[in-house]
């Protein structure tokens, strides 16, 4: 509380040191910011079936309409403010055709890094779709945003665009691919 003694005419200075400024700033911003109406609307819109359309366009790098660009910008902004979830997450994928499964899993070999250009929906609840041919598990999650407040039924955790994950393990049992991922910052 008290300042340490100083010598007259001394050029010493006093300041606050922050080890990781970016992390501190992100944490401060998240704690002291509420979602705007547009940001909250974007989260709710994502939870609806709009997530499928926007993610498909982002995944395939298809041009977005002006409305979709605003939607993505508002959702990006919202995810910077929403608290992160820490723990285990899962994601279930069901494909119509076996060749689609094979096409999807070709990049999921141990040690490889995969990048998702789209928003990535996961759950901290039980397996979302036990009939999915691909079950993805994210261990030690720290970067996913907990949107369960808006989608409690699915216990959804949403990753921002362009997140990278390292493949830790990939096994196939009873026709189901089990893939374990680790977040890369």
Predicted regions and their residues:
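Mono-ADP-ribosyltransferase
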Residues: 11, 26-185
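Acidic, glycine-rich two-metal-ion catalytic cores of nucleic acid-processing enzymes
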Residues: 1-23, 27
């Amino acid at each position: 509380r008290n300042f340490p003694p100083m010598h007259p005419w001394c050029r010493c200075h006093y300041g606050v040191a922050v080890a990781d400024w970016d992390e501190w700033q992100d944490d401060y911003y998240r704690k002291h910011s509420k979602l705007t109406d547009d940001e909250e609307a974007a989260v709710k819109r994502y939870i609806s079936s709009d997530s499928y359309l926007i993610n498909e366009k982002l995944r395939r790098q298809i041009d977005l309409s002006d409305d979709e660009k605003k939607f993505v910008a508002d959702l990006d902004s919202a995810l910077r403010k929403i608290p992160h979830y820490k723990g285990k997450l899962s994601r279930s994928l069901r494909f119509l055709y076996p060749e689609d499964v094979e096409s999807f899993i070709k990049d999921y070999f141990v040690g490889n890094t995969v990048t998702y250009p789209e928003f990535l929906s996961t759950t901290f609840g039980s397996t979302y779709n036990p009939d999915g041919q691909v079950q993805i598990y994210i261990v030690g999650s720290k970067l996913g945003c907990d949107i369960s407040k808006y989608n409690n039924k699915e216990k959804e955790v949403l990753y921002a665009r362009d997140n990278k994950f390292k493949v830790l393990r990939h096994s196939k049992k009873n026709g189901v691919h089990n893939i374990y991922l680790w977040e890369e910052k």
